Curated annotation (Swiss-Prot):
Its cofactor is Zn(2+). It comes from Shouchella clausii (strain KSM-K16). One of its GO terms (cellular component) is cytosol. Pathway: tRNA modification; tRNA-queuosine biosynthesis. The gene is tgt. This is Queuine tRNA-ribosyltransferase.
Amino acid sequence: MTAAITYEHIKTCKQSGARLGRVHTPHGTIETPMFMPVGTLATVKTMSPEDLKAMDAQIILSNTYHLWLRPGEEIIKEAGGLHQFMNWDKPILTDSGGFQVFSLSDLRKITEEGVHFRNHLSGEKLFLSPEKAMQIQHVLGSDIMMAFDECPPYPADHSYMKASVERTSRWAERCLAEHKRSGKDSVQGLFGIIQGGEYEDLRKQSANDLTALDFPGYAVGGLSVGEPKDVMNHVLEFTTPLMPEDKPRYLMGVGSPDSLIDGAIRGIDMFDCVLPTRIARNGTCMTSAGRLVVRNAKYARDFSPLDEKCDCHVCRTYSRAYIRHLIKCEETFGFRLTTYHNLYFLLNLMKQVRQAIMDDCLLDFREQFFEEYGFNKENARNF
């Protein structure tokens, strides 16, 4: 039986150790390292599937928790699965819903069986278990599914984190058993999630537990939750080597330009984040010269593009002054333009990262990019 998800290693950058590869899925092949736009409710906010294809998005992420609540998995099942429902014929990754249960619901009770919580929209009592998270994702029909994990708060003490890691490992085993029982493991790949916070011994314990289960891919969870960037990079330095070299490695919830480059240097293949779409709706844009808040008054008569060096449709067509006007008036078209540009910027950045790995010069690329973006300045504004 052919595995649903396989990883093909192409090259390691001699200068940085970053990996160039391909992830093969039932809906196509993805070049890595890569960034995944987030389509929480079966849509990347303000973008059409045609927009996403035009900017060369290879895969999108959707959210199990939100789709379970609205419209419900039964409606998506009637549509023929998530790909059919949203008219997207490329790969989809779905998260397990764990992060949302822990971040959106104030009233929750963690038991060995799963998590009891209240629907953040209606207040209705709900229960999500590893098995239920798998069953919903089977109906959604995503190419890559994520195991249901416990998402501990940051910071958390060692004893709390150890108990959490051990529960996540037991839940991962249950997820895998349910996935195999369903018979869907030939058409959907299930990734395990390594937890452990900033504790090296717990990351090692989590990685050992999960790699023993032989998932087709592995994610690093519990980062980008408020810790400083240098802590995240340090955790990646001791966690990534614990992950199999012949499987994809996914850093969850990371999407700032510096973190994408630094993550790739530390051996990560896949990234996702709501950052580019969320900040776009506030009029904040990523450009080759750094962060640009287009709603600011100084752009009222600025008829240049958002980014002189960007060749996206928005930068070729519209001015800062026009986009500022739209954003100030809360016109949806303005949010659409800034969203398109930000997503294009990150997808194009990852193309440049892949080329730099091919050319064995990713550290040189990082130095030049950081200098132009302004990351090297004292008190540099990040996202």
